[in-house]
Regions:
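N-terminal leader segment of winged-helix/HTH proteins
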Residues: 1-27
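N-terminal helix-turn-helix DNA-binding core of bacterial DNA-binding proteins
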Residues: 19-58
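Amphipathic alpha-helical dimerization/coiled-coil segments
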Residues: 18-21, 101-122
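Canonical helix-turn-helix DNA-binding module
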Residues: 46-88
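Basic, amphipathic "hinge/linker" alpha-helix immediately C-terminal to the N-terminal HTH DNA-binding motif
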Residues: 82-103
């Protein structure tokens, strides 16, 4: 199987995407905040602080701080579990969906602007 993208190309693309996102997107999220946001949108629910902490191998307080920021930006929403008040579910929002769509579009655009990257599967 031929290499689709080299490690150098991957780092170059990452650098371009991060730089473009700082210029063009409305939010400057940390890696942890981005990981939580992507987990909520890319993995099947339910999403709780507890399972997010376990799957990302990050402390519950750190996940709570990330969710605090994401909630204030309306990228995710907290919802109390009616059956177990200790649990808090994390839910998607329209604003979060739009942000991630724009972020994905930015990644695709930057990848297309790198002539040496083969975007087709090998």
């Amino acid at each position: 199987m031929s290499e689709i993208i080299t490690t150098q190309d991957a780092l170059n693309l990452w650098q371009r995407v991060v730089s473009s996102s700082l210029r063009e997107l409305p939010y400057d999220l940390s890696q942890r905040q981005t990981a939580v946001l992507l987990a909520v949108y890319m993995t099947p629910p339910p999403h709780t602080i507890r399972n997010m902490s376990s799957s990302l191998n990050v402390s519950k307080p750190a996940i709570c701080r990330a969710v605090d920021v994401l909630s204030k930006l309306d990228l995710v929403r907290r919802k109390k579990d009616e059956e177990d008040r200790r649990n808090v579910f994390l839910q998607r929002t329209i604003n979060g969906s739009v942000f991630l769509r724009d972020f994905a579009d930015l990644i695709v655009r930057e990848a297309k602007n790198m002539p040496d990257i083969n975007l087709k599967a090998a």
